Amino acid sequence: MTAIQYQQGLCRLPIQLLLTVCCLNLSVLTAKAAPFSDVAESRVNYQKVIAGPKQTCRSLESMTTTEFTVVSARQENGACRVTGVIPREIRFEVILPDGWNGRMMMTGNGGLAGQPLEDENYRKTREHMLAQGFATVYTDTGHDNRIESGATFAYRSVDKLIDYGYRGVHLTSQAAKRIIKAYYRKAPKYNYFSGCSNGGRQALMAAQRFPDDFDGILAGAPANQFTGLKFSQAHRMKALKDDPLTLAEVKELAKHIYARCDDKDGLKDGVISDPRSCDFEPARDLPKCSGADLTTCFDEEEIEALTSFYSPIIVAGEEVYPAFPVGSEGEGANYGGVIAPGWMPWVINPAGRPLLDVLGSDFFRYIVFVQDNPAYDWSSFDFQTKPDNLEFTRAVLDATNPDLSAYKAGNGKLLSYFGWADPDINPLTAISYHDEVDAIVAGDVDDFYRLFMVPGMFHCSGGPGPSSFDAITPLINWVEKGIAPDQIIATHLENTQVLFSRPLCAHPKVAVYDGVGPVAEATSFQCQKL
């Protein structure tokens, strides 16, 4: 089976190339598996048409300004598709439906961005939003990953790194608003942003740096501790480099972890609801081999490697990323005939390089050192030393500023979600950021920012937990009607069939089984603060 087949099974999306960010293409609404599925229950009729075009689509080509150039404006399938470029190379697209609902929806990018405007996955996402009446917006953030794959766009280019870090999304949102207003003779009443992974980082960056850009922001699995994440990817790959685990060994590892932790929530259901309750130590809890290297036991080198794998990431004496919780080792549902653990193909990949290796290596070659070196071997990185470009990298790429006072003051609403079984980005970073915001912003953080942790969900979607849910509709209800979401009903699907449902609870509450009702039904669970 090829790496692409694995990714299709795990991510439920077609992928073109392993190096084009793979499953991180799930940054946009498709990662949610069920965007707009709750539209019928919405308190806002966001499908209602409020305006139509006030000029021809083609006439927008004359709208070029000093801030952006309109490259083309063409009528396609009941909408006006506008493409343009912002100096220097930030390409963007705005699609304007003939029947507009008065809202703008911008989608984020996965991984290291650069997905072209023609990218099939992103086009499908925008078409889905377009069908609801949104004017849709998208940008490649300043580079084309078909030409500059990975982080090669940052090779000796600080400007492109800044465009990727935050400038591309901001400038595109400004250009899009002008184009929308010109076409309909009416500005968007509400502006939204949605993204997962790097798209989640972009979402938090917008709230922190440009609080007036979006009224409602949906941030999924945000990679906001970007630099720490990259060190984590390298650390975990380095831990397993000399003695990589086989697929059989990962399944054996998962068996022992789930045997110890699955029922901590009172239910033995194949889902670790909150891995913080799980006390797992490889040296204590895994069977040790005596003699032959068998797949049902672990030798000393493997146990030592796993101990390092689950440890905090320390660089030059500073903890830059928390220890990874357990949970992503388990298998997800059967997608396209593939049953695989969450570690596949992130941590292990029989078909090629693990994704953590693919996604992390370019950070050391083109970003975190002043002197770029395309030949740099990340496995040689000395974690006792501090890279000479680290602080600048943090300033440009990390979205960790907890002071969201300006976003709150502007009545913005931030809804975030994160899978507890994410094999790439540590879910604990979402909780720590939420709690930091709570500590620094005056008033009740729940008034404008709510976080929903998703038990058993892998990176942005999939996994053994309830990973199919609509977070867009609750966000719109919150922004436009002031109805804050206390819970979101999620389901676990296999071949479009609902196997069970659970409520996702606003942090710090968690779903607790009432001990009476059917365990497959969300009504048998209550959101409680433990």
Please report, for each region that a protein language model flagged, where it lies by residue.
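Catalytic-loop region of hydrolases
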Residues: A34-R103, T107, Q115-K124, K268, ...
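Short beta-strand/loop motif that positions the catalytic acidic residue
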Residues: S416-F418
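Cap/lid segment of the alpha/beta-hydrolase catalytic domain
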Residues: G111-R185, F231-S232, P374-P387, R394-V396, ...
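A catalytic-pocket lid/entrance helix-loop region that shapes and gates access to the active site
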Residues: M205-A207, D212-I314, M453
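Histidine-bearing beta->alpha loop at or near hydrolase active sites
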Residues: Y449-G462
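Alpha/beta-hydrolase fold nucleophile elbow
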Residues: K186-C196
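Bacterial N-terminal signal peptides
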Residues: P14-S27
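Gly/Ala-rich beta-loop-alpha elbow adjacent to hydrolase catalytic centers
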Residues: G195-G199, A203
